[in-house]
Amino acid sequence: MFKLFSTKWFRSAPVVATIWIVLTAGILVEWNRFVPDLLFHPGL
């Protein structure tokens, strides 16, 4: 399993970018689920 992380294709830019975007989207979704009013301010 750990040899997988040292392979060349896993460290390529599309794979790293996809993992980064998925993690960022997941963090935003979970943040908005627990604290729904901090991301969108309808009064502004």
Swiss-Prot record:
Instruction: Provide the protein's localization.
Output: Cellular thylakoid membrane
This protein's major location comes to membrane
* Keyword Transmembrane helix attached: yes
A GO BP entry is: photosynthesis
Q: Which UniProt keywords apply?
A: Membrane, Photosynthesis, Photosystem I, Thylakoid, Transmembrane, Transmembrane helix
Bilayer topology term = Single-pass membrane protein
Name of the protein in its database record: Photosystem I reaction center subunit IX
Which organism does this record belong to?
Answer: Prochlorococcus marinus (strain MIT 9211)
